Amino acid sequence: MPKLNKVTPFEQHDKRPKGIYILPNLFTTASLFAAFYAIVQSTVGNFGNAAIAVIVAAVLDMLDGRVARMTNTASDFGKEYDSLVDLVAFGLAPALILFEWGLQSLGKAGWLIAFAYVATTALRLARFNTQDSPSKRYFQGLPCPAAAVLLAAAVWTAESYGVTGTSFTVAGLVLMALLAFAMVSAMPYRSFK
């Protein structure tokens, strides 16, 4: 005799409005918009605006997870979507900003270090997504939003003081390489979740 699926009585179904599941993903989408804006601004030479957009993306990234936990709407879809957006916002956008601003003059070496930063961001995210953390209080490796904010803050600060990207080339190269290494290192970093 075939086994029948158990039917859940209507009164036991989740009564939350379906729209509440959209709320955390709206923050994630806003983070993606900020990353896209950062990329566009960097391609037209507005590096200060691009840097600020990456910082805005980081703030929105902090909020999407908190909103999902507060509203009890965390989902596998949301986790995957957040990770894809993180790669764009904290890997591609800051790498392109720094490349356009100061690494372009290095030719192949410039785009190789920028690509290495994007690749280590992807590796950091993949490790975070697949590895059970022994401690909720610490991350293994520098979180990619922190690395991106440090790069963006360096560009924004330099731009504010009139420092051009070409005079920041070596410092930018070293900073990007150090942050790329820190993301994939085994060093513990405190979590503020």
Regions found by a protein language model. Give the residues of each.
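N-terminal TM1-TM2 helical hairpin plus the immediately adjacent luminal interfacial "cap"
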Residues: 40-46, 62-79
